[in-house]
């Protein structure tokens, strides 16, 4: 019985070591680089202001010249 327990314990330790040895830390680096790219895209993206479209249907972006005029007034 003790021999069986010892064998199971050794097998468990070997499997645990194999899991640790084959862990992929690269995935964490890829995830971090993807997060960095998202942050850069969020910084670059500029929000657009919308106004009601002609005839009251839908929304359309406010033209930049009109927006700049309103902001500078």
Swiss-Prot record:
Its main location: secreted. The keyword Secreted applies. Transmembrane segments: none annotated. It is found in: Secreted. One of its GO terms (cellular component) is extracellular region. Residues 1-23 form the signal peptide. It comes from the Eukaryota. Salivary gland (at protein level). Keywords: Secreted, Signal. Acts as a competitive inhibitor of host thrombin. Interacts with human F2 (thrombin). This is Salivary thrombin inhibitor XC-42. The lineage of its organism: Eukaryota, Metazoa, Ecdysozoa, Arthropoda, Hexapoda.
């Amino acid at each position: 019985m003790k021999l069986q327990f010892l064998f199971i314990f050794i097998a468990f330790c070997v499997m645990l070591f194999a899991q640790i040895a084959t862990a992929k830390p690269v995935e964490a680096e890829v995830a971090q680089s993807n997060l960095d790219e998202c942050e850069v895209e969020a910084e670059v993206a500029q929000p657009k202001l919308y106004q009601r479209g002609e005839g009251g249907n839908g929304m359309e972006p406010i033209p930049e010249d009109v927006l700049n005029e309103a902001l500078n007034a």
